[in-house]
Design a protein with these regions (language model features):
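Aromatic-lined glycan-binding groove of carbohydrate-active enzymes
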Residues: 1-33, 68
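Terminal-tail/helix-coil boundary detector
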Residues: 7, 35-64, 79, 95-147
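Surface-exposed, flexible loop/turn segments at secondary-structure boundaries
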Residues: 20, 80, 92
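Short Asp/Glu-rich motifs
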Residues: 23-25, 81, 96
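A generic short alpha-helical patch detector that favors 3-5-residue windows
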Residues: 27-28, 50, 86
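Glycine/threonine-rich phosphate-binding loop and adjacent beta-strand/alpha-helix elements that clamp
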Residues: 72
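Hydrophobic, secondary-structure "cap" segments at the distal end of domains
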Residues: 75-76
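Glycine-rich phosphate-binding active-site loops on the catalytic face of alpha/beta enzymes
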Residues: 83-93
Length: 147
């Protein structure tokens, strides 16, 4: 999809840039959100083991650069898209975003982060959009409600 967007000058603006906080926490580290966000668990828990390989590498590069995991994850993402959508609920979240803008990962570091990645199946709302739906004029996810 990234190649198509680049060729057609379409901006990619991914949401959940830190995978519900998973890319900002070391394996085993938790937070209130990680413990209580049922929707994020639905999206990410099935792939936790394979994702931890990437999370460990994000932590390793954060240590090497003397910065946060948030900064490393967002710095990588900014090499792939035009505008990641990030949220901040605490002041230190903004610091990580600022650090990401200043951090430049080498091509080798970017490849190191990407190497263990395995594509995930779509879940949640995105999984409702099927290939068959692509033929219709509009695709809506409205539950039982008519639009």
């Amino acid at each position: 999809m990234a190649k198509l967007c680049h060729e057609d000058n379409i901006a990619m603006t991914p949401y959940s840039a830190l995978a519900g906080g998973r890319l900002s926490k070391r394996p085993g580290e938790t937070s209130k959100r990680l413990a209580e966000d049922d929707y994020a668990r639905l999206k990410y828990d099935k792939t936790r083991e394979q994702d931890e390989a990437i999370i460990r590498r994000v932590a390793e590069l954060a240590d090497a650069h003397g910065t946060s995991m948030t900064a490393v994850a967002l710095a990588w993402l900014m090499t792939k898209v035009t505008a990641p959508v990030v949220g901040a609920t605490k002041p230190h979240h903004i610091e990580g975003m600022t650090q990401a803008v200043e951090l430049e990962l080498t091509p080798g570091e970017r490849a190191y982060l990407e190497e263990p990645y395995v594509p995930h199946a779509l879940v949640g709302v995105m999984a409702q959009n099927t290939a068959a739906d692509a033929q219709s004029a509009h695709v809506w996810s409205a539950g039982e409600q008519s639009i």
